[in-house]
């Protein structure tokens, strides 16, 4: 129906069609995880996902140290996206897999998962984006809270780990905060980009112009446009408002989904992670288990990144590893990883 309507109004294009394919890849991965006997081992699924995050983080660290690959913003500024083209995609993917590593460590008490988390934390920070800086800090803080203050039915922290975490909070965490602030102040591009931190948050990571243009475009929609979207015409009309040389998204997933695909399709796409988030919140308050705790953090970060920086609902890379969380949530009573 979307394609037919967009063909009628002249809004159908390979670009919008590929966006739909990328999103539907999520359902393909979910179906594969749930239906294929090869993925019946939860340990195998979790380890494979975490290994991807570790390898991606090592690539970022290697590229940063030896100054190869793509710069995050420009070649002269802090940050690298290694050999990955989409900085936000790989950044959010590593953040989600870092959360998975934290969960796996507390579930199994296998120190290899903790080491994986530390590697991914370092790799994510070297991307140099606001999302990676604050996302990593949020994950580490959530880990510290879970160790020091939370009471889980299936996990209890050792006294040794609590002492290490306290030392980490007072020494390493302060060092990282000071280091990040220093990097931003000394880097000409980042210092301009994050000159007013509150303004950055209020303007949705500098996307205020993109959002304004998209809202103006959607404001002119008729009833059918609202239902089925305008496809590439949505991007073209944004381009006119922005005076850009090419069609442009708002880079805020809910707005882009509604603009290109309409509210009907967007509702079903946006609904699943939001439904799982509330389900995990309810489950956590009911049973206080470790999977619900980390799933809430992962889903909150995914949805927050979708609204703040985009590249979540529309990224096949991110969606593939979000599917791992959905897979674990749907099988929470059967999980036995090592």
Regions found by a protein language model. Name each.
Residues 111-114, 260-303, 331:
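Hydrophobic transmembrane alpha-helices and their immediate junctions
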Residues 51-59, 155-179:
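Hydrophobic alpha-helical membrane-interfacial segments at the cytosolic entry of transmembrane helices
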Residues 46-71, 85-150:
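Alpha-helical transmembrane segments of multi-pass inner-membrane proteins
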Residues 1-4, 44-47, 104-111, 154-157, ...:
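Transmembrane signal-anchor hairpin modules in multi-pass inner-membrane enzymes, especially those
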Residues 1-3, 7, 11-37, 50-53:
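Aromatic-anchored transmembrane helix interface
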């Amino acid at each position: 129906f979307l394609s037919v309507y967009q063909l009628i109004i002249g809004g159908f294009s390979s670009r919008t069609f590929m966006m739909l394919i990328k999103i539907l890849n999520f359902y393909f991965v979910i179906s594969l995880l749930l239906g294929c006997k090869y993925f019946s081992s939860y340990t195998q699924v979790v380890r494979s996902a975490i290994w991807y995050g570790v390898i991606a983080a090592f690539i970022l660290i290697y590229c940063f140290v030896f100054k190869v690959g793509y710069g995050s913003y420009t070649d002269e500024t802090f940050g690298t996206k290694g050999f990955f083209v989409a900085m936000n995609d790989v950044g959010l993917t590593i953040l989600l897999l870092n959360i998975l590593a934290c969960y796996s460590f507390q579930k199994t008490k296998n120190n290899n998962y903790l080491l994986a988390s530390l590697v991914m934390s370092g790799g994510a920070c070297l991307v140099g984006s606001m999302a990676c800086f604050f996302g990593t800090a949020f994950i580490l803080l959530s880990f510290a809270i879970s160790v020091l203050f939370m009471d889980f039915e299936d996990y209890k922290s050792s006294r040794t780990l609590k002492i290490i975490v306290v030392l980490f909070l007072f020494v390493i965490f302060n060092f990282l905060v000071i280091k990040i602030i220093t990097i931003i102040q000394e880097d000409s591009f980042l210092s301009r980009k994050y000159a007013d931190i509150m303004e950055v948050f209020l303007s949705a990571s500098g996307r205020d112009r993109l959002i304004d243009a998209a809202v103006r475009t959607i404001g002119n929609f008729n009833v059918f446009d609202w239902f089925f979207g305008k496809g590439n015409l949505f991007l073209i009309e944004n381009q006119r408002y922005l005076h850009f040389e090419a069609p442009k998204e708002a880079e805020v997933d809910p707005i882009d989904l509604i603009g290109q695909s309409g509210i009907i399709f967007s509702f079903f796409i946006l609904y699943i992670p939001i439904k799982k988030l509330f389900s995990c919140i309810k489950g956590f308050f009911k049973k206080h288990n470790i999977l619900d705790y980390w799933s809430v953090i992962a889903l909150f970060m995914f949805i927050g990144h979708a609204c703040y920086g985009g590249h979540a609902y529309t990224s096949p890379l991110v969606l593939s590893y979000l599917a791992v969380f959905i897979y674990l949530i749907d099988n929470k009573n059967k999980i036995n990883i090592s």
